[in-house]
From Swiss-Prot:
It catalyses: a 14alpha-methyl steroid + 3 reduced [NADPH--hemoprotein reductase] + 3 O2 = a Delta(14) steroid + formate + 3 oxidized [NADPH--hemoprotein reductase] + 4 H2O + 4 H(+); lanosterol + 3 reduced [NADPH--hemoprotein reductase] + 3 O2 = 4,4-dimethyl-5alpha-cholesta-8,14,24-trien-3beta-ol + formate + 3 oxidized [NADPH--hemoprotein reductase] + 4 H2O + 4 H(+); 24,25-dihydrolanosterol + 3 reduced [NADPH--hemoprotein reductase] + 3 O2 = 4,4-dimethyl-8,14-cholestadien-3beta-ol + formate + 3 oxidized [NADPH--hemoprotein reductase] + 4 H2O + 4 H(+); a 14alpha-methyl steroid + reduced [NADPH--hemoprotein reductase] + O2 = a 14alpha-hydroxymethyl steroid + oxidized [NADPH--hemoprotein reductase] + H2O + H(+). The keyword Transmembrane applies. SUPFAM superfamilies: Cytochrome P450. PROSITE patterns: CYTOCHROME_P450. Belongs to the cytochrome P450 family. Pathway: Steroid biosynthesis; zymosterol biosynthesis; zymosterol from lanosterol: step 1/6. It is an enzyme of class 1 (oxidoreductase). This is Lanosterol 14-alpha demethylase. It is a single-pass membrane protein. The gene is CYP51A1.
Length: 502
């Protein structure tokens, strides 16, 4: 045991020299890691890290790290995609490694990923992975804070409100919101595209998904509350205890309380008025669980928060990245604009849902953006039972992961995998031929219920933007990926625009 502790201390000491470069904050971080490493090494020594595998079972290849506890956290944090692709080349589709005291097993490629997407919740559990992130943001009693059977009922209620009849109403709402938002942009200039689209996504989603009462209260102060609440989706929130007095945690918790109060008032007003409005708020107010119990006001408010914020990330990042892909390829951008005239009419009348469905090139551009820049790099579950895949057995306690980003650019599956080519979907591609090669919205029991709304939202916003402006890169700069956030956003996303001549 003493040898183990000495080994851990020696390695951590070397790591401090290499990693911190004398930086005090970094040294304190490593010191904390060392303390945690002692606990980790003790558990390792006494054999309590995981139950033994069945006799004859073979563990996945393990990528050894010289740094206890932290493991590969630094290398993975700097370049996660390259790390996973290199590991795939060296070890194959299934491999394990340690970060911050947890063992992660990745399943790369469609065949290996099938284990996660086809699994039952009692074998690969989602709540134990995501609850510490989502519960402080959405609230108690919804999403990953409840048993999976209850969550599935809640998703079914929300999905019933995300229907074509509502989508038909949403198109005109989103178009009007978009036109109003871009009035402030003027004739030409340079703007932060990601910030702008994040704001617009909140405005349009709130109007469509929350109803006019809640949208009418969405001013700058409330928008900041949403931003503070959204700040709860962070690496710190996932890694650290929620009771720590961090500024971001305090802002998140205050925003949660204030937004809930806004929702409570809107819900109470709707209930008291007896007015029946055909929107998702009304759908939830009239929904019941299988046992006949109606949703409480707190559950309705939490589900509305979850519906907005879960979709906001997908739509804002995808919309922004697509803008830069179109700005880089002006020929493609012009084709998308001409498609507007071909499908909708030369005079570009107000958009309709049926026209939106026929904008096939724009649809393929969204699909290709989601392939190369999926908002979420990793989908994760906690192994509760031994699971076999590709001849290996994954022990209980492993964090089992699939990376849409890696699967969607795997060289064994995709031709010209790094090229932005929307026309690849006109022919046979892994997206249609391999079940889990293309999974930006997940698959199986946890597939995103907001996928169709996201397409309606993004297509309507970009149809309107293409009618208003031409877009260009600034001095040829195409944003790199910001891997420091949970959602992989564009770095320095400034774009140049000029109003189209009529």
């Amino acid at each position: 045991m003493l040898d183990l502790l000495q080994a851990g201390g020696s390695v951590l000491g070397q790591a401090m020299e290499q990693v911190t470069g004398g930086n005090l904050a970094s040294m304190l971080l490593i010191a904390c890691a060392f303390t945690l490493s002692l606990v980790y090494l003790f558990r390792l020594a006494v054999g309590h890290l995981a139950p033994p595998l069945p006799t004859g079972a073979k563990s996945p290849p393990y990528i050894v790290s010289p740094i206890p506890f932290l493991g590969h956290a630094i290398a993975f944090g700097k370049s996660p995609i390259e790390f996973l692709e290199d590991a795939y080349e060296k070890y194959g589709p299934v491999f394990s490694f340690t970060m911050v005291g947890k063992t992660f097993t990745y399943l790369l490629g469609s065949e290996a990923a099938a284990l996660l997407f086809n699994s039952k919740n009692e074998d690969l559990n989602a709540e134990e992975v995501y609850s510490r992130l989502t519960t402080p943001v959405f609230g108690k009693g919804v999403a990953y804070d409840v048993p999976n059977t209850v969550f599935l009922e809640q998703k079914k209620m929300l999905k019933s409100g995300l229907n074509i009849a509502h989508f038909r109403q949403h198109v005109s709402i989103i178009e009007k919101e978009t036109k109003e938002y871009f009035k402030s942009w003027g004739e030409s200039g340079e703007k932060n595209l990601f910030e702008a689209l994040s704001e617009l996504i909140i405005l349009t989603a709130s109007h469509c998904l929350h109803g006019k009462e809640i949208r009418s209260q969405l001013n700058e102060k409330v928008a900041q509350l949403y931003a503070d609440l959204d700040g709860g989706f962070s690496h710190a929130a996932w890694l650290l205890p929620g009771w720590l007095p961090l500024p971001s945690f305090r802002r998140r918790d205050r925003a949660h309380r204030e937004i809930k109060n806004i929702f409570y008032k809107a819900i109470q007003k709707r209930r008291e008025s007896g007015e029946k409005i055909d929107d998702i708020l009304q759908t939830l107010l009239e929904s019941t669980y299988k046992d006949g119990r109606p949703l409480t006001d707190d559950e309705v408010a939490g589900m509305l928060i979850g519906l907005l914020l879960a979709g906001q990330h997908t739509s804002s990042t995808t919309s922004a990245w697509m803008g830069f892909f179109l700005a880089r390829d002006k020929t493609l951008q012009e084709k998308c604009f001409l498609e507007q005239k071909t499908v909708c009419g030369e005079n570009l009348p107000p958009l309709t849902y049926d026209q939106l469905k026929d904008l096939n090139l724009l649809d393929r551009c969204i699909k290709e953006t989601l392939r190369l820049r999926p908002p979420i790099m990793t989908m994760m579950r906690l192994a509760k039972t031994p699971l076999t895949v590709a001849g290996y057995t994954i022990p209980p306690g492993h964090q089992v992961c699939v990376s849409p980003t890696v699967n969607q650019r795997l060289k064994d599956s995709w031709v010209e995998r790094l090229d932005f080519n929307p026309d690849r979907y006109l022919e046979d591609s892994p997206a249609s031929g391999e079940k889990f090669a293309y999974v930006p919205f997940g698959a199986g029991r946890h597939r995103c219920i907001g996928e169709n709304f996201a397409y309606v939202q993004i297509k309507t916003i970009w149809s309107t933007m293409l009618r208003l402006y031409e877009f260009d890169l600034i001095d040829g700069y195409f944003p790199t990926v910001n891997y420091t956030t949970m959602i992989h956003t564009p770095e320095k996303p400034i774009i140049r625009y000029k109003r189209r001549s009529k």
